[in-house]
Amino acid sequence: MNVKEHVISLPRRVFVGHDIIYDISIYFSQLGITSPFLIVTGTKYTKKIADKVIENLPKDAKYEVIEIDTATLDDVYKVEEVVKKVNPNILLGIGGGKVIDVTKYAAFRNNLEFVSIPTSPSHDGITSPFASIKGLQKPVSVKAKEPLAIIADIEILSLSPRRLINAGIGDTIGKIIAVRDWRLAAKLRGEYYGDYTASLALMSAKHAFQCTKIINKDIKYGVRMLIEALISSGVAMGMAGSTRPASGSEHLFAHAVELLHPEGVLHGELVGLGTIIMAYLHGINWKIIRDRLKKIGFPVKAKDLGLSDEEVIKALTIAHTIRPERYTILGDRGLTWSSAEKIARVTKIID
């Protein structure tokens, strides 16, 4: 398939290491980043990390802080109100997935650069030029701004709740399915397929898979491996110009569940469940994926996440409608109720 123009959006610099948050003013100097800054952060643990960042900014730096709890369009508007007031040179997103998504979308809408400073390795939005914002037409990722730089402090990331770390592993292993779906769409629909970006996404998944062997023994080494996999996955999306290499039928299932059960479940947890199910459909060894996830304490049953059997089955039957333009193993018609129930039981997602 011939593509007239292919735009690649990538970060300019990625900093990964231990206690590197204390060197933030050095990194900003290297990149020519100057105040005023608008710092977007959370209200609890992430606010404490933001305070550390503020302590290590250049002494004469001017900044404003806004705290958010969710990733909705209203949160984006709140950030934009402060943007108009402060007129910042750059936005700093210090937090988990929700904070970084709001920051990058606000940066995109206001033609500003932003720096991604993750406090948990929960999903690949750390790097990607796409954001998941509630309040838009559908629960899928929209075009946003790629980070100018990423500052990933392993000491900070290793202290994040284990549930968030596991969610990041689930999100990244899902790339195995995303790439299979992409290949299928290229073969059956003539969709553009990028070998290099697909390989990069698969490498991220393999790293996350390897991480399941390490994380229980050495949390810091495991988290470093995971954060590098998440960054690589985000880069793959930037190179592809879409979420295709990182989001397939496993994500469609996750988004479908989020419509039916919007609170209390992490995105990466749902992607992990979706990966097990879609691996079965693709003829991939789903049992190995399930066993590896289970060993790290990942919830591999719907009831572990407070989901009912009916919610899982319903999600499987509507998943293909979430992004009808994105062809996957689910096809155009999706799954019948009986097929969905059978698959969910065979893969032990429901009893």
UniProtKB/Swiss-Prot annotation:
Catalytic class of the enzyme: oxidoreductase
Residues binding Zn(2+): 171, 251, 267
Details of cofactor binding: Binds 1 zinc ion per subunit.
A GO CC term attached to the entry: cytoplasm
Compartments in which it is found: Cytoplasm
Cited Pfam families: Fe-ADH_2
Source organism superkingdom: Archaea
Subunit details: Homodimer.
Protein name: Glycerol-1-phosphate dehydrogenase [NAD(P)+]
Species annotation: Saccharolobus islandicus (strain M.14.25 / Kamchatka #1) (Sulfolobus islandicus)
Gene giving rise to this polypeptide: egsA
